[in-house]
């Protein structure tokens, strides 16, 4: 779940990477000036989604997407498609 595309998307695009997807990082390394935080709430440090030049948590992103299509921090278009850089921590699927 999360790393595989649906059958319709795979039939449409094949195995090539889909353009325009924002990456969601589960654990970011420490930056030059400390930890990376959500620029809207300043509390979230995990599960951040890259906006144009800053990061947003999933909660703040959904709140901003319910208000409109533009970011309150930078004024650019909000990301709507997310790709996980690491696989989420879940038990392996035995099927």
Curated annotation (Swiss-Prot):
Q: Where is this motif: PTAP/PSAP motif?
A: 88-91
A GO cellular component term found in this entry reads: membrane
An example GO BP is: viral budding from plasma membrane
On the tree of life, the source organism's domain of life is: Viruses
Q: Which residues form the signal peptide?
A: none
Q: What is its main location?
A: virion
Post-translational modification summary for this protein: Myristoylation is required for the role of RING finger protein Z in assembly and budding.
Q: A Pfam family for this UniProt protein?
A: zf-P11
UniProt keyword annotations, A-Z: Host cell membrane, Host cytoplasm, Host membrane, Host-virus interaction, Lipoprotein, Membrane, Metal-binding, Myristate, Viral budding, Viral budding via the host ESCRT complexes, Viral release from host cell, Virion, Zinc, Zinc-finger
Which residue spans match zinc fingers labelled RING-type?
A: 38-74
All disulfide bonds of the chain are none
Family annotation (InterPro entries): RING_finger_Z_arenaviridae (IPR024183), Z_RING-type_Znf_sf (IPR038485), Z_RING_Znf (IPR003224)
Spell out where lipidation (N-myristoyl glycine) occurs. 2
Provide any one GO MF term from the record: RNA binding
Cell compartments where the protein resides: Virion; Host cytoplasm, Host perinuclear region; Host cell membrane
Q: How would you describe this protein's topology in the membrane?
A: Lipid-anchor
User: Which HAMAP family has this protein been placed in?
Assistant: ARENA_Z
| Family (UniProt) | Belongs to the arenaviridae Z protein family.
**In UniProt terms, what function does this protein have?**
Plays a crucial role in virion assembly and budding. Expressed late in the virus life cycle, it acts as an inhibitor of viral transcription and RNA synthesis by interacting with the viral polymerase L. Presumably recruits the NP encapsidated genome to cellular membranes at budding sites via direct interaction with NP. Plays critical roles in the final steps of viral release by interacting with host TSG101, a member of the vacuolar protein-sorting pathway and using other cellular host proteins involved in vesicle formation pathway.
Q: How does it assemble?
A: Interacts with protein NP; this interaction probably directs the encapsidated genome to budding sites. Interacts (via RING domain) with polymerase L; this interaction inhibits viral transcription and replication, Z partially blocks the product exit tunnel for the releasing nascent RNA product. Interacts with the glycoprotein complex; this interaction plays a role in virion budding. Interacts with host eIF4E; this interaction results in eIF4E reduced affinity for its substrate, the 5'-m7 G cap structure.
User: What remark about domains does the record contain?
Assistant: Late-budding domains (L domains) are short sequence motifs essential for viral particle budding. They recruit proteins of the host ESCRT machinery (Endosomal Sorting Complex Required for Transport) or ESCRT-associated proteins.
Protein name, entry field: RING finger protein Z
Q: Which organism is it from?
A: Parana mammarenavirus (isolate Rat/Paraguay/12056/1965) (PARV)
């Amino acid at each position: 779940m999360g790393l595989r595309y649906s059958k319709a998307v795979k039939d449409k695009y094949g195995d090539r990477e889909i353009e325009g997807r924002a990456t969601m990082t589960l654990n970011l390394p420490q930056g030059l000036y400390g930890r990376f935080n959500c620029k809207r709430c300043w509390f979230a440090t995990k599960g951040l989604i890259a906006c144009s030049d800053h990061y947003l948590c999933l909660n703040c992103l959904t709140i901003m997407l319910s208000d409109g299509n533009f970011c309150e921090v930078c004024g650019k278009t909000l990301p709507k498609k997310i790709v996980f850089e690491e696989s989420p921590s879940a038990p392996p699927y035995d099927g």
